[in-house]
Amino acid sequence: MDGSGQYLIPGLWDFHVHLAYDQRFTEAMPGLFLNHGITSIRDTGGPLELVLPAVESIRREGAVAPRVFFAGPLLDGEHVVYDGDNMPLLGIGNPDEATARANMARLDEAGVDFVKIYEMVSPEVFAVLVEEAQARGLPMDGHVPLSMQARDVGPHVQSLEHLRNIEMDCIANPRATVAERRLVLANPEGVPGGTLRSQLHRAYRIPSIEAYDEVGCREVLASMTSTIQVPTLRLNALALQPPFTRADWGEVLAKLPEDAAAEWGAMDGSMGGRSTDTTYPDWSMFLVNLMHESGVPIGAGTDTPIGFAAPGYSLHSELEMLVRAGLSPMEALRAATVRPAEFFGLEGEMGTIEPGRLADLVLLSGNPLDDITLTRSVQAVVTKGHLLNRAALDALVR
């Protein structure tokens, strides 16, 4: 293939996807990712009974699909947020240390590539999960548990998602508020996990942002210089850049499974019931810039298909938001290539274009270092050494 006058970059990652969150998308996702130049994905949580078949299908010999790395279910606490009753089934409970050890053994046996700790775990269970993951050689991802301070979590995990709950440690007296949250998390009334988490977010998120303490926040970020932050700005800051206001949104919907496209098309003007207040979106953009200035590594992930995150397409929106937040185009590209490889200890095999590296490549018609939006100008993809031209990529989607 003649690439004269075009631009070659390493294959892109979406570092935060959910293959099983909405099963209308599961079968279509591999083609949608490749169609947009995403050659590797990290599935950050779902039940094994749903995720394993999807992973096995993607990994089967001859499959035209991205590389996939998966975590299995979210490792939550006594009260599970994504419990399958009040929220989609993504998590499992770890009410005590013995259960946590048993769950880690089961996930390791199932062949997970990493594990993800969720928001309702206790400090005691968190410590056990960290110990087990380290003993088993499994990288750790997660949200900052509501029972803990971000500065006590970051040094023990390799990545954190959504900037979640970091604002609660960026105040003058975070120890007092974490003690308050622990009292609420005792949950004597047995409130469902998802409801309990939402109550705590409402009670502490915006007040913490309003009480921002720069000295305290710098201390928090100093603890995270070896922890990849995956801010999912296209989700956190959805109100600042709704995808359905873009001129190409109709083309995006046309590639999606018909039932999901119809639903998104009907609800997009209302933000799907999401808030249009920009306090948290603005904070998210501010915090990513502060992290960038503080030397905290940033990874690019979307949370697709949550929050109008069209698989594949949304990764380019995330790169644009990272640049808007203060990263250079090169740094944004590293967030979708080098950083994910580093998480898995694969920086000697993936993430850059060098002899001997895995053959995952994307050919663009424009230079993304001049304009990050040009990562959308995909002309061809090499996935696992196989070349797919534009016609072949378009044939992967409806």
Regions picked out by a protein language model, each given a short descriptive name:
Residues W13-R24, D83-T99:
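Active-site mouth loops of central-metabolism enzymes
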Residues T26-E27, L50-R59, T302:
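Metal-dependent catalytic neighborhoods of phosphoester/phosphodiester hydrolases
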Residues V64-L89:
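Metal-cofactor-binding active-site regions of metalloenzymes
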Residues M29-V51, A65-P73, E109-V121, V130, ...:
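Divalent metal-dependent hydrolysis catalytic cores, especially in the metallo-beta-lactamase
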Residues A310, S328-L333, E342-V378:
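Acidic, glycine-enriched loop/beta-strand segments at the rims
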Residues N103-I117, V121, I166, C170-A325:
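Active-site neighborhoods of metal-dependent hydrolases
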Residues G5, W13-H16, G37, V68, ...:
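Divalent metal-coordination and catalytic microenvironments
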